[in-house]
């Protein structure tokens, strides 16, 4: 058995080496047949001697048993998006803002890979969990599929606990092979490598994912505590040493002109790459400076994504159709002769409003220029008057709603026409779609087509009716088998337990967004207390402006809305805030109410763990030192934050002092 154990270890080493050469370096030293022969030898050994199968075995790359569904998991820290820059002016404004806050700066420029963001968690050096970005707060667990990607190490070169983030993508070579195979089988082709990568990672059968030959570039570490890195560039070098694949086409530059030169280089050379990129990511390189700048609610202040100019194509405008949103806004949509734009076929594009149509002199029958805004949303940029046919038709918006026939109005200060009929069918359907959306009640399986069927069948007329649906209601619907019905009813039941902020946002109160819904839910705790609130009270709340206050009070005073809320209560839909009320956290006086900054490397816990513990004691953890900071906890190699705290006379604790205070509380 000792000989067999040695052979297993030898096979691991050889297969990992050959895999790295093929998938990462693109320079294989042995033919595919040799790799396959060794892999099958290892598979046979593991089948006959299961005790030799390890969690990091190369056979894991083949894929395992199919899953029933993907589990949703909360990210330890949110996967934020980046702010966008579309031109030189945007970049220079970003640079000016950076220099005004932190002075001299070095930037790290990296290629923006056009793929799917993923988060990879390692415990004691082993890959244990991989998530999609999802909505930034919650992602899907696609661990088994990610294990099939050879560029992802199943075991790091050091036994660290770490979470890294990167972009999974499909190389162009793999994409062409996949579509050739689909074409042979008379299957629908993927529009572009990004869609193919996303579809491949969401396969319930990881064996199918394994066949798609995906890859990944790692671009960040969630917690730098265990890294001897002072900068983004050093962190990427550390990741390379640990066995991760980072993109080597990166560059450190000393100023914004260097950034612009890097962008110019890769704008002209992007087609020479074996994978798609859709822009350039620019980051402040120094990690202390990143900490000093901090984050907005949606994105880091120290980074920005430059998006390549959108591809423009010419096609014919066949017609203009209207759609009505949940707030009654009537939006014109261009119906186009199908055309390829940025890798996908486009037959519809936004025209925004009537003023834009007239300002750009866009007529039905015109040749028009179409692009994708941010490479995502198709829009008509302009018409080409010199190619206009004689029978081109000037478009005029209707005076009445195409859905309900109610007269359309233009509210003062707005460019959009609006239907103000509260019983307009189109608005009601859009409101239902919003109610079940991810950031609202998040009811999986209740998509647009099912909502439309339910509404047309008069099974639902308002959002409360969703909670009255039965198996008998759902089974007759198109493409609704028993399993789908069971899953949908379970999702509806689960949605009853959502916190109050989800319900508030889902109700679609005009001007009330996700953040304001959270603020109101936390402050008033129950829907009953909110029903008694006045406009004067609301405007006193930070983050709630005049428009929101007026809209909320007007909405909740409506008798039909109060009846709707009662209807929801009758089905036991939760009306209470379930989150932690930050103002009510009863922490120790040593921490409660204090503003605390963490800086430097901590050895006895991660910075994330320290932040969570401080928050549990009622402290506010911030990323930058100001005159309002109460305490700075300084770990090893604390930099500019420590210096600033000393100059401001702020109380400073060492890591050991902080740990001692924790131990005092726990004793």
Curated annotation (Swiss-Prot):
Record-listed NAD(+) binding positions: 32-36, 81-82, 110, 133, 167, 283, 307
Cofactor(s), names only, from the UniProt record: Mg(2+); Mn(2+)
EC number of the protein: 6.5.1.2
Entry keyword annotation includes NAD: yes
Gene Ontology CC annotations of this record: cytosol
Occurrences of domain BRCT (ranges): 586-667
Function: DNA ligase that catalyzes the formation of phosphodiester linkages between 5'-phosphoryl and 3'-hydroxyl groups in double-stranded DNA using NAD as a coenzyme and as the energy source for the reaction. It is essential for DNA replication and repair of damaged DNA.
The protein, known as: DNA ligase
């Amino acid at each position: 058995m000792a000989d067999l154990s040695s052979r297993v270890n030898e096979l691991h080493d050889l297969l990992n080496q050959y895999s790295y050469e093929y998938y990462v370096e693109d320079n294989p030293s042995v033919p595919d047949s040799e790799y396959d022969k060794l892999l099958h030898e290892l598979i046979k050994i593991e089948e006959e001697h299961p005790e030799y199968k390890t969690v990091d075995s190369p056979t894991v790359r083949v894929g395992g048993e199919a899953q029933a569904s993907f589990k949703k998991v909360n990210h330890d820290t949110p996967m934020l998006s980046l702010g966008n820059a579309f031109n030189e002016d945007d970049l220079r404004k970003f640079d000016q803002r950076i220099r005004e806050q932190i002075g001299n700066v070095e930037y790290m420029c990296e290629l923006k890979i056009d793929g799917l963001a993923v988060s990879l968690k390692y415990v004691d050096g082993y890959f244990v969990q991989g998530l999609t970005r999802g909505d930034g707060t919650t992602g899907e667990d696609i661990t088994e599929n990610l294990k099939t990607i050879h560029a992802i190490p199943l075991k790091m070169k050091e036994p660290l606990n770490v979470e890294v983030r990167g972009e999974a993508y499909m190389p162009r070579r793999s994409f062409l092979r996949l579509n050739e195979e689909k074409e042979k089988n008379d299957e629908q082709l993927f529009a572009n490598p990004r869609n193919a990568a996303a579809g491949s990672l969401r396969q319930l059968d990881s064996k199918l994912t394994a066949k798609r030959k995906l890859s990944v570039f790692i671009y960040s570490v969630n917690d730098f505590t265990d890294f001897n890195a002072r900068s983004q560039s050093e962190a990427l070098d550390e990741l390379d040493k640990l066995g991760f694949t980072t993109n080597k086409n990166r560059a450190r530059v000393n100023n914004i002109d260097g950034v612009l030169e890097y962008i110019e280089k890769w704008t002209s050379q992007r087609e020479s790459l074996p994978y798609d990129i859709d822009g350039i990511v620019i980051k402040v390189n120094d990690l202390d400076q990143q900490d000093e700048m901090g984050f907005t609610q949606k994105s880091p202040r120290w980074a920005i994504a430059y998006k390549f100019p959108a591809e423009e194509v010419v096609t014919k405008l066949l017609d203009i159709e209207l759609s009505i949103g949940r707030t009654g806004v009537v939006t014109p949509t261009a119906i186009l002769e199908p055309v390829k734009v940025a890798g996908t076929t486009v037959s519809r594009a936004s025209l925004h409003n009537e003023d834009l149509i007239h300002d750009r002199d866009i007529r039905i029958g015109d040749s028009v220029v179409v692009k994708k805004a941010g490479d995502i949303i198709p829009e008509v940029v302009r018409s080409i008057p010199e190619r206009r046919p004689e029978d081109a038709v000037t478009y005029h918006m209707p005076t009445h709603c195409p859905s309900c026939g109610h007269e359309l109005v233009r509210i003062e200060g707005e460019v959009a026409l609006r239907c103000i009929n509260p019983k307009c069918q189109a608005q009601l359907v859009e409101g239902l779609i919003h109610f079940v959306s991810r950031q609202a009640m998040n009811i999986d399986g209740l998509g647009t087509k099912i909502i439309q069927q339910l509404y047309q069948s008069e099974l639902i007329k308002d959002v409360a009716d969703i909670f009255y649906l039965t198996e008998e209601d759902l089974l007759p619907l198109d493409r609704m088998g028993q399993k789908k019905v069971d899953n949908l009813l379970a999702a509806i039941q689960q949605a009853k337990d959502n916190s109050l902020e989800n319900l508030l946002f889902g109700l679609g109160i005009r001007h009330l967004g996700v953040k304001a819904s959270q603020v109101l839910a936390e402050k008033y705790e129950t829907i009953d207390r909110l029903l008694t609130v006045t406009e004067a009270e609301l405007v006193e709340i930070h983050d709630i402006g005049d428009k929101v206050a007026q809209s909320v009070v007007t909405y909740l005073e409506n008798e039909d809305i109060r009846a709707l809320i009662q209807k929801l209560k009758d089905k036991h839909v939760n009306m209470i805030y379930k989150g932690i009320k930050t103002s009510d956290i009863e922490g120790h006086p040593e921490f409660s109410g204090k503003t605390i900054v963490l800086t430097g490397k901590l050895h006895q816990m991660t910075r994330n763990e320290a932040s969570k513990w401080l928050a549990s004691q009622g402290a506010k953890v911030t990323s930058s030192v100001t005159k309002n900071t109460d305490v700075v906890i300084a770990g090893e190699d604390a930099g500019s934050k420590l210096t600033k705290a000393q100059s401001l006379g702020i109380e400073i604790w060492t890591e050991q002092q902080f740990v001692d205070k924790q131990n005092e509380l726990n004793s």
